[in-house]
Amino acid sequence: MSPDTVNNAVIDKAFEDNAPLRKRVYSAIASTPEYTSLFEDIAKYATTLRSGLGRDASSACSQVRVAATGEGPAAKKRKLINGSEGAVAGTGAGSANDAALLAGLTADAELQFYVQDLSFAIPQRKKLRLELTRLVSSAAGAREGYLRARNQASNEVEFGIPMSRIQHILCLPVPEKTQRQFNFCIIPEHGDGISPVPDHQLAFEPIVWTIPDGPPRTAYLGSGTPALESANLAETYESYLKRMLDDNLRHTKVICPSEKEFVSPTPEAHRKGDKAYHVKAFRGSKEGFLFFLSTGIFFGFKKPLVFFALENIDTISYTSVLQRTFNLNITARSPAKPDEVQEFELSMIDQSNHPGIDAYIKKHGLQDASLAEARRAKRLNINGVKGGDGGTDSAANHAGESEEEESELVKAQRELEDREDEEEEDYDPGSEGDSDGSGSSSEEEDQDGDGQEDYDGEGKDLVKEELGKMISPKPQYQQTYNG
């Protein structure tokens, strides 16, 4: 098909009050004439929305137009998408697909379920109606799902995201609340705080809403039937939304915290009977909460959210280790730009959480950069000054758990232990803790904290003394981990 066969009247009418967008549509048609019919269908649909469905639908269409062109106030531009430049500006199949996604977001589509009066925190702080719709594409016959938030007063779609553009969905308990609540966090493609948005590609914002712990009284099926009529007696907002979202997701599932992954030794501050799955931390001056999940590490709940997928984490190290707190440095690489390394520092983490975090790192085979040569000197200097932090020793406490994770120093210690076992057969282990306070090198403490934490049941550790002589003659006060 040639651009000469374009129905100019249809496109001109649909975009008569938006010349820049009309120009971009014509540019895209000229570059990819095979999508001419699709752009005409979109134009017809936009015209129908504006003229046939009333003021509210016209306003929703206007939001798409504002977002796509980058015009209007910043608050209005954020309503549907972020990084909107290039939503229809680019050329090729991507531009056509993005335009179709934007149109589908506000389309009068089949409603799967909805929940009234949900409290949203991101990208807007207000109560809205959550909807899950499914639209049949006329081009390929495919069914695309959309998760969107509708203003219950104006009936406008405020923002949303196609289900196919969701990278991760998390259901996390809200910390430090007297009543149990949960935050559902939608992490879109290129919205994890690490991956940059490719040029001329549509990007959606993360979405966060809060639900109470109780029966889903404001949830309804698409037909309007209350969800409670078909739900079991134990159904809650959490279980209902998790089930409905999982049923409509093809490439991911809702992820919740698990005690198998991480649980804080300190219970919830206002609910002593509930376990806490979060760790309080700071990123710069911004306070937030860390969650260690089966698919990655999440930091929220204030903008900007950051989600470190396990596959994107390069290294993890402990720095600024003090007697009561330590910092966690996460080095990550974006799949789109694997050569570019980004480093994130999460500070002021309580020492009591160190064993659980360290176990999480080891479990998932993440490189513990606190044992790396490049980090060792800085951390030892901190230890020498502070003289009493046990966090550094605990950071390396499990270094020998896996043969693949052992450094050359730990392997050397194992060999020395074997030799000492043969030479000291008459040695009586004695009571634990006899060697506390004895001089040992800071290098040896950094590599293996087993002796100083008295986990192995040994008394005076001759192996460590020998190893300390091999590594560094400089003594250091014995440290005790306070976790």
From Swiss-Prot:
Molecular functions (GO terms): DNA binding; histone binding; nucleosome binding
Residue stretches of biased makeup (Acidic residues): 418-435, 442-456
Region (Disordered): 382-483
Domain of life of the source: Eukaryota
Ranges annotated as biased composition (Basic and acidic residues): 408-417, 457-468
GO CC list: chromosome; nucleus
Main localization, broad class: nucleus
Subcellular location: Nucleus; Chromosome
Keywords on record: Chaperone, Chromosome, DNA-binding, Nucleus, Transcription, Transcription regulation
Entries under InterPro entries matching the protein: PH-like_dom_sf (IPR011993), RTT106/SPT16-like_middle_dom (IPR013719), RTT106/SSRP1_HistChap/FACT (IPR050454)
Annotated Pfam families: Rttp106-like_middle
Function: Histones H3 and H4 chaperone involved in the nucleosome formation and heterochromatin silencing. Required for the deposition of H3K56ac-carrying H3-H4 complex onto newly-replicated DNA. Plays a role in the transcriptional regulation of the cell-cycle dependent histone genes by creating a repressive structure at the core histone gene promoter.
Binding partners and assembly: Interacts with histones H3 and H4.
Family listed: Belongs to the RTT106 family.
Full protein name: Histone chaperone RTT106
Record organism: Ajellomyces capsulatus (strain NAm1 / WU24)
